[in-house]
């Protein structure tokens, strides 16, 4: 059985956020800890409508996030289980921890845009 632990050894530190990631049955599972306030607006540039087009399911285990859609916004807090349909832009508070499940194939385009935009913002 494939599994991932929140304390597992494969930690990726992106400066603003630390993430442990595994692929399980066609889904990417992330344990994320936000170290600085994160507004994903700039990171999602270049995607359709400059919004994440990958659906996500998860739980906020600590902190909160604000998720903006074209026609409304939602706040998700500690203990809340969420579904983010395509077309969202999240913002995370410092100290927020989430466990998130995303279809791996759909997440690929989002991850590529984030890495490209992060490199551009860092001047690399």
Language-model regions: role of each:
Residues 19-21, 31, 57, 73, ...:
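Conserved hydrophobic/aromatic beta-strand scaffold that supports enzyme active sites
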Residues 25, 68-72, 93-95:
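Short strand-coil-strand connectors
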Residues 41-43, 77-79, 109-112:
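A short, polar/proline- and glycine-enriched secondary-structure boundary/capping micro-motif
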Residues 50-67:
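Short, conserved beta-strand element in jelly-roll/cupin
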Residues 61-62, 86, 94:
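A cytosolic small-molecule/anion-sensing beta-strand core signal
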Residues 69-88:
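Short acidic-glycine-tyrosine-enriched beta hairpin
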Residues 91, 95-124:
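Double-stranded beta-helix
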